């Protein structure tokens, strides 16, 4: 629906711009198959802010992938794209963002991407009924976290081209992509559909710190969660929406330890959240993904149990995690 005060043309341009951001971000899944030197944007002209966003995303967001595949850091990339500043809709003043009459009830809240881990669980705990819970390719963990918050879980489906799996099985390059950027872009499109003007994330302070250095170059496994990435994403959103959409993390000032101490105050979420790598596999089915259980052996499980242990009795700890990995 066109928002009150928006022309149909403006709304169409906004939706087209948001879809463009999804395509630019999601392209990282396919770029990594061969990491080509030339990257061509063939979906028409893009704004300067989108160009800055996508260049940085495919550089810093793919450095972990490059390092683990023994590729140059930074990757050698030459861009073929056309910039058209006239694509941006007229900017509106924040606080005066109009919404569709039929979506006003949903617009009372902020759209929160829910992965099911401790960060999104805490965001829902903080926002309460002001949150609109949203997930992509729903599994047991986000369903459980949304239910613990007393919220309906809105969903979207993302399907990777099956050819990508074929290439992987034949030995194509594979590895980490900036998933948070893909999730944020899809969430922005979903926010517009639900009448929300904010996409609220749960990215913490340490996400802005490099996780390793390669040849003097910073590599950050969590770059897509960093403050720099957030600012670049907001710049691109401003360019395509005229200020109608905002994204930010309410956990940005806090450390992992502080987030753990905050989560223990919500008993419902303590029994619902799941921060386990085995629950988020793509091609490989796991019990953790299907049933929402902890494997207790992946780096994420080890880190999370270590963060939570000081705040829980041994009995409560074992109830939540189904074991005692710190003693095994």
Predicted regions and their residues:
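ATP-dependent adenylate-handling ligase core
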Residues: 137-275, 279-291
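RNA-binding accessory domains that recognize and position tRNA/RNA substrates
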Residues: 1-109, 126-161, 195
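Short helix-capping/linker segments at secondary-structure and domain boundaries
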Residues: 29-42, 191-199, 308-319
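Short glycine/serine/threonine-rich phosphate/pyrophosphate-binding segments
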Residues: 120-123
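Long, compositionally biased intrinsically disordered regions
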Residues: 85, 98, 300, 308-328
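Local cysteine-cluster metal-coordination motifs and their immediate loop/turn environment
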Residues: 277-279, 291-306
